[in-house]
From Swiss-Prot:
Catalytic activity: tRNA(Ala) + L-alanine + ATP = L-alanyl-tRNA(Ala) + AMP + diphosphate
Enzyme class: ligase
Binding sites annotated in the UniProt record for Zn(2+): H567, H571, C669, H673
Gene3D superfamilies per UniProt: 2.40.30.130, 3.10.310.40, 3.30.54.20, 6.10.250.550, Bira Bifunctional Protein, Domain 2, Threonyl-trna Synthetase, Chain A, domain 2
Superkingdom field: Bacteria
Pfam assignment, any one: DHHA1
Protein name per the record: Alanine--tRNA ligase
Function: Catalyzes the attachment of alanine to tRNA(Ala) in a two-step reaction: alanine is first activated by ATP to form Ala-AMP and then transferred to the acceptor end of tRNA(Ala). Also edits incorrectly charged Ser-tRNA(Ala) and Gly-tRNA(Ala) via its editing domain.
Location relative to the cell: Cytoplasm
Cofactor field: Zn(2+)
Organism, as annotated: Bacillus cereus (strain ZK / E33L)
EC numbers for this chain: 6.1.1.7
GO cellular component term, pick one: cytosol
Molecular function (Gene Ontology), one example: transferase activity
């Protein structure tokens, strides 16, 4: 067998299928673009759904890729098994209605066994097929020469996700030899069984049937191929190592961790070996995910990253690492993956900063968790139990990130145990919630629809013209071809030549009219058809529109003018964000309309007011410099060498359109732009907000919209100045004066309230009753808020020295209740928190707190007197 690195295997796979006429699809971002069904890209086929479901017709129906992927449904097994990972690469070859079983099997066999490629010994390979797939059996047996005894028929070899495309699959297994299993009495020791000897290296799915709603299967009009080979597993076989973690894809991270910890991998300690594996796996996942724009948080993708980092930190303690260190592994990951993913090294400083910040936070969290755990232990002792409940242990784990193992250690020190079964029950409930929320990757939807059949040419000329003579080359109504559209009817059409821009890259579509003799057609929207033509959504306002009609296509120039101002402004904004916030900023989405622009970008904190001011000023300065906007066509490699920014979620061909604003901004973009920045006029930021973990949004306006916004704001300023009887330029001074007056009045009010409270407290001492030898005061008082209630409580406790006091006040139909117990009575079992909870429950509320002071609220003012009457009963119950 050849000696190959993981990087060489990846490149060899892509080169092989490129030789077989496949287009190499770049590895997409781990953060799905326009696919809400996925938390992460989790397979090679996930990024190709648009081709399989017919929304987009690929230029080449043969596709190959090496797709980075994340799966987190089995995190707890990572490190325990030889091949569980959260981050992995899936190598695949795909056919969209082109070749089928014979080619897929033949090429897989060639790649695996040819000396030019991997060069496996054919005798060490076995395959599994579906019992009824005689076609696959014949190809394997007669064409590939695989003997019958190494072709295993298994019922589970059928790919089916319910309604939609489905079909049999065949899997290829490699025999690693007797060192990995030689007990042939083991019922699982066969290719396809649960064993370490026969490893699956490749899965070929033959999508040939449609699973109908009635449960029947019918042949698909177009048959597809979807294959997957895990790079990590393949590398472990080629490099002849026991687990994926022992390959050159993981060992550099393990080696770096050895250096940091002073511990050794594979030194006879299985727990420490597991820690090395967990750290190596999780830092790969976090590094790539952060590089693709995800950031740690308490929800969604961010929660996954936070959980992975915290799990790795917890395992690092087994290696005696008690400081932030994971960030030091980020450049190691970058070096391992630099051949295919150079962007990791390019972003290593930012990624390391994010990881270090999260590590530091978790070390603080561990400290906080210890405090919460101390409260849990105290509560358990108070309830006279030696078991920490599974609910409490899970809350510590899930909310505070406090590992169950640490909870058990602390519990043992306190002479207690943890309800592990209860904890696992809570974990299973969480898994059930996750399973319920998870959606299967529906990569191949039902085929059909006439738009995918339309192959006529349609040229977009809208960059240089706003009106053109054209012909209707395709006309569709209600999803079917039609020869005409009558007045009031809606439909879709294609033109042989069109000035109408189809919505893409965040820029909305043009609108306008198609005109002919006696015919007027409103163009409401324009989208890309499956084969790439501009598809116009129209409604006939006058006359009858027929297929092949000659029309004049005219866009709404006023609308386009506003759109291009906003689009060029987004390019200036993008660069300004990088200048002010840092090079880690990447576009995460945009919307360019005629009214405003919206720009989403990656950033791990709120943009401060002074930063926003700098960003806005930079954009306006570039507008006022009257910079020419130059647009050119470049080879993709040349454009990248120039430093052009490729945008989020976009796919680019060999030749790209480059939009350059002087020497300031350089981006790949297919949208429409101004000729000179001066046309934008002015740029004004309207809002900045967070829209998700690590993603911020800026909304802004330009030109006329910016003028109208600022004019409205100046008008409001003048109106406010008038009401305060001052000039706009003096309004801040006037506001400061008013605030000072209000503050002084508040002080006087508080002083007066305190005096009144003291007087009322003095009067209340006459209402003190003695219950079983305890001074008790329960009274409804007339105070404004809880602060005044606390002041009165302090006065009463000082005056009475030993007492149980409960005060209630009513304001705006809301009840405030405060309970206080002096120190001498706390030791006798009196507890303000328990008391106030009982009182509040009797007037429709709840609350709690410390033994000496506790507060609550109620919703039923009419029941306050009755609730206060309970205080005497409480004192009697404790004194017994």
């Amino acid at each position: 067998m050849k000696q190959l690195t993981g990087a060489q295997i990846r490149q060899m796979f892509l080169d092989f299928f490129q030789e077989k006429g496949h287009a190499v699809e770049p590895s997409a971002s781990l953060v799905p673009h326009e696919d809400p069904s996925l938390l992460w890209i989790n397979s090679g086929v996930a990024t190709l759904k648009k081709y399989f479901d017919g929304r987009v017709i690929p230029q080449n129906p043969r596709i190959t890729n090496a797709q980075k992927s994340i799966r987190t449904n089995d995190i707890e097994n990572v490190g325990k098994t030889a091949r569980h990972h959260t981050f992995f690469e899936m190598l695949g070859n795909f056919s969209i209605g082109d070749y089928f079983k014979e080619e897929a099997i033949t090429w897989a066999w060639e790649f695996l066994t040819s000396d030019k490629w991997i060069g496996f010994d054919k005798e060490l390979l076995s395959v599994t097929i579906h019992p009824e797939d005689e076609e696959a059996f014949t190809i394997w047996n007669e064409k590939m020469g695989v003997p019958k005894e190494r072709i295993i028929r298994l019922e589970e070899n059928f790919w089916d996700i319910g309604e939609g495309p489905s079909g049999p699959n065949t899997e290829i297994f490699y025999d690693r030899g007797e060192a990995y299993g030689n007990d042939f009495s083991d019922p699982e020791l066969y290719p396809g069984g649960e064993n370490e000897r026969y490893l699956e290296v490749w899965n070929l799915v033959f999508s040939q049937f449609n699973h109908n709603p009635d449960g029947s299967y019918t042949p698909l009009p177009k048959k597809n191929i979807d294959t997957g080979m895990g790079l990590e597993r393949m590398t472990s076989i080629v490099q002849d190592v026991p687990t994926n973690f022992d390959t050159d894809l993981f060992m550099p991270m393990i080696g770096a961790t050895e250096t940091i910890s002073g511990e050794k991998y594979r030194n006879g300690d299985l727990e420490k070996d597991m820690a090395f594996k967990v750290i190596a796996d999780h830092i790969r996942t976090v590094t790539f995910a952060v590089g693709d724009g995800a950031l740690p948080s308490n929800e969604g993708r961010g929660y996954v990253l936070r959980r992975l980092l915290r799990r790795a930190v917890r395992y690092s303690k087994k290696l005696n690492i008690n400081r932030p260190f994971m960030f030091e592994l980020v450049p190691v990951v970058g070096e391992v993956m630099k051949d295919f993913y150079p962007e990791v090294l390019e972003k290593k400083d930012f990624i390391a900063k994010v990881v270090k910040n999260e590590e530091e936070r978790f070390h603080e969290t561990l400290h906080d968790g210890e405090a919460i755990l101390a409260e849990v232990i105290a509560k358990a002792k108070e309830e006279k139990t030696t078991v920490i409940s599974g609910v409490d242990a899970f809350r510590l784990y899930d909310t505070y990130g406090f590992p169950i193992e640490l909870t058990e250690e602390y519990a043992e020190e306190a002479g207690m145990t943890v309800d592990h079964e209860g904890f696992e029950n809570e974990m299973e409930k969480q898994r059930e919630r996750a399973r319920a929320a998870r959606q299967d990757v529906d990569s191949m939807q039902v085929q059909g629809g006439v738009l995918g059949e339309v192959k006529v040419a349609s040229e977009f000329v809208g960059y240089g013209t706003v009106a053109t003579e054209s012909n209707v080359v395709a006309l569709v109504k209600n999803g079917e071809y039609t020869d005409s559209l009558q007045v009031g009817e809606e439909g879709q059409l294609m033109l042989d030549v069109t000035p109408f821009y189809a919505e893409s890259g965040g820029q909305i579509a043009d609108r306008g009219y198609l005109l002919a003799d006696g015919v007027k057609v409103l163009v409401k929207d324009v989208q890309k058809a499956p084969n790439g033509q501009n598809l116009h959504k129209v409604v006939v306002e006058e006359g009858t529109l027929t297929k092949d009609a000659a029309v004049k296509a005219i866009i709404d120039t006023k609308n386009r003018s506003s759109v291009v101002k906003n689009h060029t402004a987004t390019h200036l904004l993008h660069q300004a964000l990088k200048d002010v916030l840092g090079t880690h900023v990447n576009q995460a989405g945009s919307l360019v309309t005629s009214e405003r622009l919206r720009f989403d970008f990656s950033h791990f904190g709120q943009v401060q007011a002074d930063e926003l001011e700098k960003i806005e000023r930079i954009v306006n300065e570039k507008i006022w410099e009257s910079i020419d906007v130059e647009i050119s066509q470049k080879a993709i490699e040349e454009a990248k060498e120039m430093g052009a920014m490729a945008l989020f979620g976009e796919k680019y061909g060999d030749v790209v359109r480059v939009v350059q604003v002087g020497d300031y901004s350089l981006e790949l973009c297919g949208g429409c732009h101004v000729d000179n920045t001066a046309s934008i006029g002015i740029f004004k930021i309207v809002a900045e907000s967070g829209i998700g973990a690590g993603t911020r949004r800026i909304e802004a306006v330009t030109g006329k919209s910016a003028y109208e916004l600022m004019n409205d704001q100046v008008g409001l300023l003048k109106e406010a100045a008038g009401k305060m009887k001052t000039n706009p330029k003096d309004i801040l001074t006037r506001v400061d004066g008013l605030f000072a007056e209000v503050k002084q009045l508040q002080k006087e009010n508080e002083s007066l309230a305190a005096k009144l409270s003291n007087i009322e407290a003095g009067n209340l001492t006459d209402s003190v009753m003695t219950v079983d030898g305890v001074n008790v005061l329960a009274a409804k008082v007339n105070v404004a808020d809880m602060n005044n209630l606390r002041t009165m409580m302090d006065d009463l406790k000082n005056k009475l020295e030993s007492a149980v006091v409960v005060l209630a006040s009513v304001n705006d139909d809301k009840v405030n209740i405060l309970a206080g117990v002096t120190k001498d009575l706390i030791s006798q079992g009196y507890h303000a928190g328990k008391l106030v909870k009982e009182v509040a429950s009797r007037c429709g509320g709840g609350g709690g707190g410390r033994p000496d002071m506790a507060q609550a609220g109620g919703k039923n003012p009419a029941q306050v007197e009755e609730a206060l009457a309970f205080v005497q009963e409480y004192v009697k119950s404790v004194s017994k």
